[in-house]
C-alpha cells in the first residue's frame, strides 16, 4: 500500500546461530518490504552476542555482503557486544539504550523466525492503531517439521493453534 509507516526497528538478537539461515530470513523480509515500497521506514539490526571469532566474523561478513547486495547501507546494521551481560534481554536493552530513541516501534525476531513483509506492516499498523499496547505477541507456528513427533506437533498446532491463541488473547 501507499501508507506511511512509523519508524520501526526490526532487531534479531543472535548467539552462535546458523548465520546463513538466520540472515537469509532477514534478507527475504528486507527484499519483500522494498518490493512493497515500505523499506524506508524499517531498519534492521543484527545484535550479536556470539563469542566464537569464526562465527562472529561470518556474521559480520554476511551482513556486509547483504548491505552491499541490497543497497541497504543505512537500513541494515550489525552490532556485536564485547560483553554479553544478561544474555538476550541484555542485548535488547543495550540496543534500546543506544538506538531506541530513533524508533517508535521495535519488532524482535528470533534467529529462526520467518515473518512476511505483510505481517511486519500489519504489526506496525496494529501498534499505530493501539497506542495503549505495550507488547503485541504473535502466536508461534511450527514449520518444516522433520521428525514424526515434530510433524504431529505441527499438525496439532494447525488444528488448535488459532483457538488457543484466541483464548489466550481473551484472558489477557
Predicted features and spans:
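Short aromatic-hydrophobic micro-motifs that form the base-stacking/packing surface
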Residues: 105-109
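The conserved acidic donor/metal-binding loop of glycosyltransferases
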Residues: 110-114
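Long helical/loop segments within the catalytic core of UDP-sugar-dependent glycosyltransferases
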Residues: 64-104, 117-172
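Cell-envelope/extracellular polymer assembly enzymes that use nucleotide-activated donors
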Residues: 7-11, 43
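Structural beta->alpha junctions
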Residues: 14-18, 51-53, 99
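Acidic donor-binding segment of Leloir-type glycosyltransferases
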Residues: 28-84, 141
Amino acid at each position: 500500500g501507499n501508507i506511511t509507516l512509523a519508524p520501526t526497528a526490526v532487531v534479531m538478537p543472535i548467539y552462535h546461530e546458523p548465520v546463513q539461515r538466520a540472515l537469509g530470513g532477514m534478507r527475504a523480509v528486507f527484499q519483500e518490504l522494498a518490493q512493497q515500497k515500505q523499506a524506508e521506514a524499517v531498519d534492521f539490526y543484527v545484535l550479536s552476542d556470539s563469542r566464537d571469532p569464526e562465527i562472529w566474523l561470518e556474521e559480520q561478513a554476511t551482513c556486509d555482503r547483504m548491505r552491499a547486495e541490497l543497497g541497504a547501507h543505512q537500513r541494515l546494521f550489525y552490532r556485536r557486544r564485547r560483553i554479553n551481560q544478561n544474555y538476550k534481554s541484555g542485548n535488547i536493552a543495550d540496543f534500546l539504550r543506544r538506538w531506541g530513541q530513533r524508533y517508535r516501534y521495535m519488532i524482535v525476531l528470533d534467529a529462526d523466525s520467518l515473518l512476511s513483509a505483510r505481517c511486519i506492516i500489519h504489526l506496525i499498523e496494529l501498534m499505530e492503531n493501539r497506542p495503549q499496547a505495550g507488547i503485541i505477541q504473535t502466536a508461534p507456528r511450527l514449520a518444516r517439521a522433520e521428525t514424526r513427533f515434530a510433524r504431529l506437533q505441527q499438525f496439532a498446532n494447525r488444528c488448535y493453534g488459532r483457538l488457543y491463541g484466541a483464548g489466550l488473547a481473551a484472558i489477557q
